[in-house]
Amino acid sequence: MGIELLCLFFLFLGRNDHVQGGCAMGGAETCEDCLLIGPQCAWCSQENFTHLSGVGERCDTPANLLAKGCQLTFIENPVSQVEILTNKPLSIGRQKNSSNIVQISPQSLALKLRPGLEQTLQVQVRQTEDYPVDLYYLMDLSASMDDDLNTIKELGSLLSKEMSKLTSNFRLGFGSFVEKPISPFMKTTPEEIANPCSSIPYFCLPTFGFKHILPLTNDAERFNEIVKNQKISANIDTPEGGFDAIMQAAVCKEKIGWRNDSLHLLVFVSDADSHFGMDSKLAGIVIPNDGLCHLDSKNEYSMSTILEYPTIGQLIDKLVQNNVLLIFAVTQEQVHLYENYAKLIPGATVGVLQKDSGNILQLIISAYEELRSEVELEVLGDTEGLNLSFTAICNSGVPFPHQKKCSHMKVGDTASFNVTVSLPNCERRSRHVILKPVGLGDALEILVSPECSCDCQKEVEVNSSKCSNGNGSFQCGVCACNPGHVGHHCECGEDTLSTESCKEAPELPSCSGRGDCYCGQCVCHLSPYGNIYGPYCQCDNFSCVRHKGLLCGDNGDCDCGECVCRSGWTGEYCNCTTSTDPCVSEDGILCSGRGDCVCGKCICTNPGASGPACERCPTCSDPCNSKRNCIECYLSADGQAQEECVDKCKLAGATINEEEDFSKDSSVSCSLQGENECLITFLLTTDNEGKTVIHSIEKDCPKPPNIPMIMLGVSLAILLIGVALLCIWKLLVSFHDRKEVAKFEAERSKAKWQTGTNPLYRGSTSTFKNVTYKHKEKQKVDLSTDG
């Protein structure tokens, strides 16, 4: 018992505890009402768990109830339950007795569902080996199928031989169809009724709807003999009455010979489309097809001219109900039509038939192998209001959500399906649901019942002393009052109870329509939006106006329909701040002096001003330059003339204040260029009325130049430059002289003079020879004379 309670405890904590307050706000007054609110809700049946006004608090999530002090044993929280009634193991390998074959597990179970809670079941399907096969060959015998009839005369033997490789228990039968024997589907002259082919001329059988010719048998030669004896017939329009034949072949179980424990294959062979639904109204037939067997003593369809063609939906119901798998063998021209039919019919396949049915054998074998390689679940029974979802786990082991079919399976492989079932609401009735593999006789039967009641409802104290001395019955921790008494403990009588004391005004509803009047006092309802309070439940904390989707702009508290703003906020929505900080421009002036600060935003009043702080104003004048006349007048005027400057300052919208008691942090510094290159500096501020005030006016003018000092300085500079140049010249000359002297001394030291000879001396006598004078002596005389 302790382990069970511990498991329940963790179950309670883990289930839907994210839903906070949804159960308690539902206003449930009984355990059953609480369960209907949602699957996350539970009821506390513990006595004296809540006070007078809190019966609804008994309904909450399990975790919340535990937190409130409810003991675990008193928490009513029924869960969905699954009871497996029959669960035989799946058959393995070949079975000698086909009646003992089990291909689905489990076979039956009972399911109790808590509304809103999902319950998952696992279903396993395994196709057994060597499963018996019943094949019924349904052939179109209209005139266009004459060559096909000749081709299949030996089909029985060939088909039995091939199928023996796949199963040791094979039977086959034969039936044929043409069309409803009534105008306008056939010609109605006596000659053409007797012989529809008389215009060719050729003899053929009269038009007929459906004939069951050979019941299912394992005698292949008998099948061949029957086929050889068949004759064709004819009709007018191209579509045939094949769907009439399919319906009769599916529902006439005894006459066809379908076995309960075999695979039912219905091979439909035709080269034309089929009539269905209301096509027979052309012939005046208006009675809907009843889906019953109507084969007469001659095994012919007796209601062909009375009942309409079956609809696709009717065919689906009967084929699934009788586990018949349909194989459409049709010509290439008709394939696209029958593929559309096959998409709607569970287990149906389509094969392309050659003109003369030459490939019919291979077509049947291929279709059989395809059907045996697929496992698909079909849902039957009362599923209205029931939510079902499937997840297929095929031989690869990979789950495929929202799929109830496995393909490419081998015989003997196990296909698993997780089936999730849920009920959206509580309906006081049980449902019978069947899950079956398409084409197989095995099925899982499920009895689904709603779980909407509490165990504590079984224990009732009638006329309990806990309910004001027997004025009611005590059940699940609360009182159910007898007639004439009301109140949570049945303490008030209806004859003495008046609701007038619960009305704020005579014309208003009791407790403002948001509470219940118990013994002359209002007990306000719980609301998921907030608290309802007041002596008449007239107040709440959630009905105030909203700003940008937030209650009281998220800057105040809602009290009885009105916003109570927090500090720093005002307005009906508490969306208006009292702070002016957002309105101060970069120069420190409120709205740049061009507007008013309202709710933390600047409303520009100067024409042309814009921007968050009215800082942009192409048409506005410079605030500093606009005060030039006022400032210059103030600086140039003497004591009496300053009064004349007041008017100029008024025109500029400013006043001059020589006092120093102002905040320099919020001031604007201005500089103006005046006459004689004087620089005027002053500060601008705004007073409480928004007017401009001028402070700290200063004028700084440059001094005139000192000409004598400038001339003296220039003269001294010229003199100094001259002296410097002379010094430089002297240095250069001295450097050159020293260089020459050094060179001379070096040359002198290298010379080697002869004794008594001055190397620097040059004689004063020079001798020249006259080349034209030939007398040598005279030359000598001349030379000596010269010397």
Swiss-Prot record:
<dbReference type="InterPro" id="IPR032695">
    <property type="entry name" value="Integrin_dom_sf"/>
</dbReference>
<feature type="disulfide bond">
    <location>
        <begin position="467"/>
        <end position="479"/>
    </location>
</feature>
<feature type="topological domain" description="Extracellular">
    <location>
        <begin position="22"/>
        <end position="708"/>
    </location>
</feature>
<dbReference type="GO" id="GO:0005178">
    <property type="term" value="F:integrin binding"/>
</dbReference>
<feature type="disulfide bond">
    <location>
        <begin position="492"/>
        <end position="519"/>
    </location>
</feature>
<dbReference type="Pfam" id="PF17205">
    <property type="entry name" value="PSI_integrin"/>
</dbReference>
<feature type="glycosylation site" description="N-linked (GlcNAc...) asparagine">
    <location>
        <position position="471"/>
    </location>
</feature>
<dbReference type="InterPro" id="IPR036349">
    <property type="entry name" value="Integrin_bsu_tail_dom_sf"/>
</dbReference>
<feature type="disulfide bond">
    <location>
        <begin position="44"/>
        <end position="70"/>
    </location>
</feature>
<dbReference type="InterPro" id="IPR012896">
    <property type="entry name" value="Integrin_bsu_tail"/>
</dbReference>
<keyword id="KW-1133">Transmembrane helix</keyword>
<feature type="disulfide bond">
    <location>
        <begin position="630"/>
        <end position="649"/>
    </location>
</feature>
<feature type="disulfide bond">
    <location>
        <begin position="544"/>
        <end position="558"/>
    </location>
</feature>
<feature type="disulfide bond">
    <location>
        <begin position="23"/>
        <end position="41"/>
    </location>
</feature>
<feature type="disulfide bond">
    <location>
        <begin position="604"/>
        <end position="614"/>
    </location>
</feature>
<feature type="topological domain" description="Cytoplasmic">
    <location>
        <begin position="730"/>
        <end position="787"/>
    </location>
</feature>
<comment type="subunit">
    <text>Heterodimer of an alpha and a beta subunit. Interacts with FLNB. Interacts with HAX1. ITGAV:ITGB6 interacts with FBN1. ITGAV:ITGB6 interacts with TGFB1.</text>
</comment>
<feature type="binding site" description="in ADMIDAS binding site and liganded-open conformation">
    <location>
        <position position="271"/>
    </location>
    <ligand>
        <name>Ca(2+) 1</name>
    </ligand>
</feature>
<feature type="disulfide bond">
    <location>
        <begin position="31"/>
        <end position="454"/>
    </location>
</feature>
<keyword id="KW-0401">Integrin</keyword>
<feature type="binding site" description="in ADMIDAS binding site">
    <location>
        <position position="147"/>
    </location>
    <ligand>
        <name>Ca(2+) 1</name>
    </ligand>
</feature>
<feature type="binding site" description="in LIMBS binding site">
    <location>
        <position position="179"/>
    </location>
    <ligand>
        <name>Ca(2+) 2</name>
    </ligand>
</feature>
<feature type="binding site" description="in ADMIDAS binding site">
    <location>
        <position position="148"/>
    </location>
    <ligand>
        <name>Ca(2+) 1</name>
    </ligand>
</feature>
<feature type="disulfide bond">
    <location>
        <begin position="252"/>
        <end position="293"/>
    </location>
</feature>
<dbReference type="InterPro" id="IPR016201">
    <property type="entry name" value="PSI"/>
</dbReference>
<feature type="signal peptide">
    <location>
        <begin position="1"/>
        <end position="21"/>
    </location>
</feature>
<feature type="glycosylation site" description="N-linked (GlcNAc...) asparagine">
    <location>
        <position position="260"/>
    </location>
</feature>
<feature type="disulfide bond">
    <location>
        <begin position="34"/>
        <end position="59"/>
    </location>
</feature>
<dbReference type="GO" id="GO:0001618">
    <property type="term" value="F:virus receptor activity"/>
</dbReference>
<dbReference type="InterPro" id="IPR014836">
    <property type="entry name" value="Integrin_bsu_cyt_dom"/>
</dbReference>
<feature type="domain" description="I-EGF 4">
    <location>
        <begin position="576"/>
        <end position="615"/>
    </location>
</feature>
<comment type="function">
    <text>Integrin alpha-V:beta-6 (ITGAV:ITGB6) is a receptor for fibronectin and cytotactin. It recognizes the sequence R-G-D in its ligands. ITGAV:ITGB6 acts as a receptor for fibrillin-1 (FBN1) and mediates R-G-D-dependent cell adhesion to FBN1. Integrin alpha-V:beta-6 (ITGAV:ITGB6) mediates R-G-D-dependent release of transforming growth factor beta-1 (TGF-beta-1) from regulatory Latency-associated peptide (LAP), thereby playing a key role in TGF-beta-1 activation.</text>
</comment>
<keyword id="KW-0460">Magnesium</keyword>
<dbReference type="GO" id="GO:0007229">
    <property type="term" value="P:integrin-mediated signaling pathway"/>
</dbReference>
<keyword id="KW-1003">Cell membrane</keyword>
<dbReference type="InterPro" id="IPR040622">
    <property type="entry name" value="I-EGF_1"/>
</dbReference>
<keyword id="KW-1015">Disulfide bond</keyword>
<feature type="disulfide bond">
    <location>
        <begin position="456"/>
        <end position="476"/>
    </location>
</feature>
<feature type="domain" description="I-EGF 3">
    <location>
        <begin position="539"/>
        <end position="575"/>
    </location>
</feature>
<feature type="binding site" description="in MIDAS binding site">
    <location>
        <position position="240"/>
    </location>
    <ligand>
        <name>Mg(2+)</name>
    </ligand>
</feature>
<feature type="disulfide bond">
    <location>
        <begin position="426"/>
        <end position="452"/>
    </location>
</feature>
<feature type="disulfide bond">
    <location>
        <begin position="591"/>
        <end position="602"/>
    </location>
</feature>
